[in-house]
Amino acid sequence: MSPNFKLQCHFTLILLTALRGESRYLEVQEAAVYDPFLLFSANLKRNLAEEQPYRRALRCLDMLSLPGQFTFTADQPQLHCAAFFIGEPEEFITIHFDLVSIDCQGGDFLKVFDGWILKGEKFPSSQDHPLPTRERYTDFCESGLTRRSVTSSQNVAMVFFRVHEPGNGFTITIKTDPNLFPCNIISQTPSGRFALVVPYQHQNCSFSIIYPVTIKISDLALGHLHGLQLKKPAAGCGGTGDFVELLGGTGLDTSKMMLLVDLCYPFHGPAQMKISCDNAVVRMVSSGKHMNRVTFEYRQLEPLELETSTRNSIPEYCLSSL
């Protein structure tokens, strides 16, 4: 098993087990029994493309990146369950309730959340999502089948559920639809290239990479100023109305992450930064007065790079270097 794959599985298992309140460190020896990142395989996606709809059982703790139909059936009381769904950056996710057999009066529940939430931290954050937090939940026990489908605002969504009675459960169908201007994204991969475009809309958009990475910005168009200026967090870009931030941290919520640098002025040409945090984010703040765009590449840091970084860094800064 490659070090990169172990790192991916390690992070995912920590994320999922935290739903049970288990904050202790997990040592992952092998991931043969539970292998959520197998579904991120491009080869698997190609092989299944001709066999849609894809069907399989849903686990109590699960992560899925493929459209299809998924059925959960409790074989014993399952009290702390969640399924994380992730699409391509340019996709919305729609969750459709096909069949639900749970006892709402007996304490069961089935809830969809627009985004991901873990240990009180949300993605997108409350600052970046168009809806207040309470409106991001859809509770089946309250709405029933009057609202059979829920569509996310970005490429991630999740389902919380609790089922007491063995044999009870539900079936859902996951579909994806194109998103012409994706705003908040969690990357499926540790490397890639993306252009975050905000066309004359007053909103904040974040691209989250749940890996330590090097980020290279090749183009930044903010529409209101010219030239390049890198300002330290103390100076800030808040007064400009349109700017890009690079953030680092250990959780999902961008509002709780550390501001490493902000970019207030458009430029062409590479600006590179190494961020050894568990989560690195490119975040664009837009006033709505301009067409803003930032194009960047990202690459996961190799283990040797991380080891070298650790020896020469302050831990709370996750080793940021521009």
Swiss-Prot record:
GO terms for molecular function: corticotropin-releasing hormone binding; peptide binding. GO terms for cellular component: axon terminus; dendrite; dense core granule; extracellular space; microtubule; multivesicular body; nucleus; perikaryon. Glycans are attached at N204. Residues 1-24 form the signal peptide. Keywords: Disulfide bond, Glycoprotein, Secreted, Signal. InterPro entries: CRF-bd (IPR008435), CRF-BP_C (IPR056178), CRF-BP_N (IPR056177), Sperma_CUB_dom_sf (IPR035914). Transmembrane segments: none annotated. Disulfide bonds join C60-C81, C104-C141, C183-C205, C237-C264, C277-C318. The keyword Glycoprotein applies. Binds CRF and inactivates it. May prevent inappropriate pituitary-adrenal stimulation in pregnancy. Belongs to the CRF-binding protein family. This is Corticotropin-releasing factor-binding protein. It comes from Rattus norvegicus. The gene is Crhbp.
